């Protein structure tokens, strides 16, 4: 593999998901300077299909992915599922356990390697709180998925 650029796609996605509104200015400037595409959003459900739908809708709406291209959608789905596994500690069906969740997400698409032949990559980051169905007793959780396009 080629030498990495100074901008790391997973780190950028994690920071974008974790920083509060108004704090992400420097990250957004870096993404724009690199001609990388991105989107952010929130999801309050733990059902995997709702998480996937929220992220997929945002990524299409902000033109991070082209919904008509299989390779774009395939890469996005794999990155989402990997991020969900991180947040849920591998137990994807948490919606059935009546867990509470408040997650922010970020999707970043770009070319993190100097070698152009390495192509584009996509990163999905999830950050927020998850816990038992007792408001106020949630804990933080984070997940990251990265896939080539």
Swiss-Prot record:
Q: InterPro entries this protein is in?
A: Regulatory_HutP, Regulatory_HutP_bacillales, Regulatory_HutP_sf
Please give the biological process terms from Gene Ontology that the record holds.
Answer: L-histidine metabolic process; positive regulation of gene expression
Name of one Pfam family that matches: HutP
Keywords for this protein: Activator, Histidine metabolism, RNA-binding, Transcription, Transcription regulation
| GO-annotated molecular function | mRNA binding
Q: Which family does it belong to?
A: Belongs to the HutP family.
Q: Which NCBIfam families match?
A: PRK03065.1 (NF002838)
Q: How does it assemble?
A: Homohexamer.
Question: What is the annotated role of this protein in its UniProt record?
Answer: Antiterminator that binds to cis-acting regulatory sequences on the mRNA in the presence of histidine, thereby suppressing transcription termination and activating the hut operon for histidine utilization.
Q: What is this protein called?
A: Hut operon positive regulatory protein
Source organism (scientific name): Geobacillus thermodenitrificans (strain NG80-2)
């Amino acid at each position: 593999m080629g030498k990495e650029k100074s901008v790391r796609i997973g780190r950028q996605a994690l920071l974008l998901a974790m920083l509060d509104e108004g704090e992400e200015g420097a990250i957004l400037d870096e993404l724009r300077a690199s001609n990388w595409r991105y989107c952010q959003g929130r999801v309050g459900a733990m059902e995997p299909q709702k998480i996937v739908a929220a992220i997929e809708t945002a990524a299409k709406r902000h033109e991070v992915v082209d919904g008509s291209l299989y390779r774009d959608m395939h890469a996005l789905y794999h990155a989402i599922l990997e991020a969900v596994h991180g947040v849920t500690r591998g137990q994807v069906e948490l919606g059935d356990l009546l867990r509470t969740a408040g997650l922010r997400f970020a999707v970043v698409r770009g070319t993190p390697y100097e070698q152009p032949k390495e192509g584009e990559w996509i990163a999905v980051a999830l950050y927020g709180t998850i816990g038992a169905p007792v408001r106020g007793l949630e804990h933080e959780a984070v997940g990251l998925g990265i896939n080539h396009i």
